[in-house]
Amino acid sequence: MSSLFQTYGRWDIDIKKAKGTYVEDQNGKTYLDFIQGIAVSNLGHCHEAVTEAVKKQLDSVWHVSNLFQNSLQEQAAQKLAAHSAGDLVFFCNSGAEANEGAIKLARKATGKTKIITFLQSFHGRTYAGMAATGQDKIKTGFGPMLGGFHYLPYNDPSAFKALGEEGDIAAVMLETVQGEGGVNPASAEFLSAVQSFCKEKQALLIIDEIQTGIGRTGTRFAYQHFGLS
């Protein structure tokens, strides 16, 4: 019996090693890996430059917490900021944590509470992430959910009319391509309507790029295809 908590439905494939776009199981069978660690290893498994950089860092400093300055962390943040519409970077452990931080920031910065998200969206399995997710199956068995989230049809520029004069909107949160929801790309017309709505309501626009960021759609971030800011 496994001692691992079964949070995922794992395949019966035990990986022994990986290189480039291939993984090999304990029996020596090789697989072409189209998943790449859910796009974490999108440079390929065991890329020489990445492996060398990790080894070098392990010989220097492992972890000293956020109580100390870290020049390499600052350099990485500057590079990320230079290729995005933002000026500041929050390093975290997962997409769900990033979304939690964005939700907290939106409410704290605006003083408002409502977050508009979309049907078939996926924003994580923490409580705020599940609450933001527009799929009931993700939430089954975990209620009651965190309040303040409202769901609209995705890719429908007219959907915002349903909100009328509703106020207290802190942010609109969306994926430029819905991943878990079925690989649904947003249209330029829809995203333009989203940005106009945010400006009208003085709400923040949160773009969840967990699956589309870092060059996976041809630009550094997918929102850059549409001139969003």
Swiss-Prot record:
What SUPFAM superfamilies does the record point to? PLP-dependent transferases
Binding-site residues, N(2)-acetyl-L-ornithine: 125
Q: Name one Pfam family in it.
A: Aminotran_3
The record's section on CDD domains has: OAT_like
- The residue range of the signal peptide is none
Q: List the catalysed reactions.
A: N(2)-acetyl-L-ornithine + 2-oxoglutarate = N-acetyl-L-glutamate 5-semialdehyde + L-glutamate
| One example GO MF annotation | N2-acetyl-L-ornithine:2-oxoglutarate 5-aminotransferase activity
Pathway given in the UniProt record: Amino-acid biosynthesis; L-arginine biosynthesis; N(2)-acetyl-L-ornithine from L-glutamate: step 4/4
Report keywords, A-Z.
Answer: Amino-acid biosynthesis, Aminotransferase, Arginine biosynthesis, Cytoplasm, Pyridoxal phosphate, Transferase
A single Gene Ontology biological process assigned to it is: L-arginine biosynthetic process
Query: InterPro entries given for it?
Result: Aminotrans_3, Class-III_PLP-dep_AT, PyrdxlP-dep_Trfase, PyrdxlP-dep_Trfase_major, PyrdxlP-dep_Trfase_small
Tell me how the cofactor is bound. Binds 1 pyridoxal phosphate per subunit.
**GO cellular component terms listed in the entry, alphabetical order:** cytoplasm
Give its localization: Cytoplasm
| Cofactor field | pyridoxal 5'-phosphate
* Assembly and binders: Homodimer.
Record-stated family = Belongs to the class-III pyridoxal-phosphate-dependent aminotransferase family. ArgD subfamily.
Additional note from the record: May also have succinyldiaminopimelate aminotransferase activity, thus carrying out the fourth step in lysine biosynthesis.
What's the protein called, per UniProt? Acetylornithine aminotransferase
Which species?
Answer: Bacillus amyloliquefaciens (Bacillus velezensis)
